[in-house]
């Protein structure tokens, strides 16, 4: 099967590597233009481009998709199918029908849930117990195409979005291989999505970082782990903003207002939240300091807890 692969970040690179390892005919790779990625403003390749270059696969990095030139390139490559994984661009309608088998996508949610960007993080942030990956045919509107296969996995109670990302990245690559095998064999299913059940999510940004102590302990814990590795949850101690990397449940009950410190000691910093409950902050990072256990921070910076 001759493939044109379109993708950009690590999540996509895992799928491309799987296709390379399985000896698919990769006619070319399309990826986002090179961007400056450090303080020196040096241009660097996307993970997908680097993998393609390392394997002598032709790379295209169009700045526009709707002027027809990218579509002409794809037609000249005569692919059997377009495979799109976290490319970062919406394909124009004419591009979807160029290849014999159309265009398929790997999406990191159980569609139609979590259409859009950052589905992995929002599954953790929302406290979901199960998530997964889907393969689907691309359609005109984002993430609305017919589903081919899904694969589910449980989310660990204290699993970060980064850890879940790594697992779903591998699952997505495996599911893509199965999908392509069955499409070529003519046995792949095609199930329309129930659009009434669809939900849409947005990109993350730093405005989400401050912890809302009026939430329940579980909501706060999931917020802490869902915002890792970026943008990371934050809390205020005095006038300083601390990054929060780990939190735990407690059995403490309190009549203090949400956000009040209930205790601070060898276990960490216990803070009041919704319903007279508390949550324990066990790992944090002070401004300009390294990440550390909250208990270790308190050894040099004790907190006086008011009654």
Model-based region annotation:
Residues 7, 29, 52, 82, ...:
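A residue-level signal for conserved active-site and pocket-lining positions in enzyme catalytic cores
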Residues 1-40:
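N-terminal Rossmann-like dinucleotide-binding module
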Residues 25, 56-58, 102:
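Conserved beta-strand segments of alpha/beta enzyme cores
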Residues 214-307:
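An anion-binding loop in the catalytic cleft
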Residues 36-78:
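N-terminal glycine-/serine-/threonine-rich beta1-alpha1-beta2 phosphate-ribose binding loop
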Residues 22, 32, 81-200:
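Donor/substrate-binding cores of folate-linked one-carbon enzymes
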Residues 8-11, 63-66, 87-90, 227:
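Short beta->alpha connector loops
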Residues 202-214:
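Acyl-group handling in specialized metabolite and lipid biosynthesis
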